[in-house]
Amino acid sequence: MSRWLDRSQELLAELAVREAASIAAAVASAVATIRSGGLIHAGGTGHSTLLALESFYRAGGLAAASPIWGIDLFPPFAARASTQEERDPVQGRAAIERAGVRDGDTVFIASQSGINGAPVEMALASAERGATVVAISSRLHAAKVKSRHTSGKHLFDAASIVIDTGAPYGDALLERGEGKAAYAPVSSLLTIAVWSLVLEGVVEILDAAGETAPIWKSSNAPGGDEWNEGMLAAYAPRVRAL
């Protein structure tokens, strides 16, 4: 059996129990946002940008979702430069401005360490606009490193709702002994699991109330394009990335 798989399954199970109340709070905020005609923004910097990709324009995902990201913050475009750019608060504020975050929206910001200027600024800028901010980060990692944001705040400090992934310090799950780098990161898996738990909760509440959950269908399945036209008509005027 795989050590990574065993430990990942343990972390997922622990997260679901330990963070149940915080996840429920995030679900409640997202439901209120959808009911008021607002948007659910999600993203981060570096590999946490995967949250933007997973949540946005995704078969089975929310049509009310809007991505928070930036080319300068995404490693595939310029890896070494992105490491420096994610430390810059200006980049974080610019990402929120591009997304068009508004009062009443719910904003999910992911960051393994929660120390860099851009994600912390994303949270602060969103809160200034009246949005509810949900931080997805690792307390284990954050506790061992100093914030790089000018305020001295970690991402957790700038959020209304905090969800701790439980990912290990340094992200890598498997140790190899003294003098060797640990390997097999797990933060992306845990972050996407958090998003999926929130998505599940949102749809269940809307369904139970007899309301329509705005969900995309696969464009690679019969009828998908036709279904999605309805979602586009409703959300393209507001979601800038559409």
Please give the residue ranges for each predicted region.
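A short N-terminal beta->alpha junction/helix N-cap motif
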Residues: 13-21, 39-43, 122
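Glycine-rich phosphate-binding loops that contact phosphosugars or nucleotide phosphates
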Residues: 35, 41-200
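Long, charge-rich low-complexity segments
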Residues: 237-242
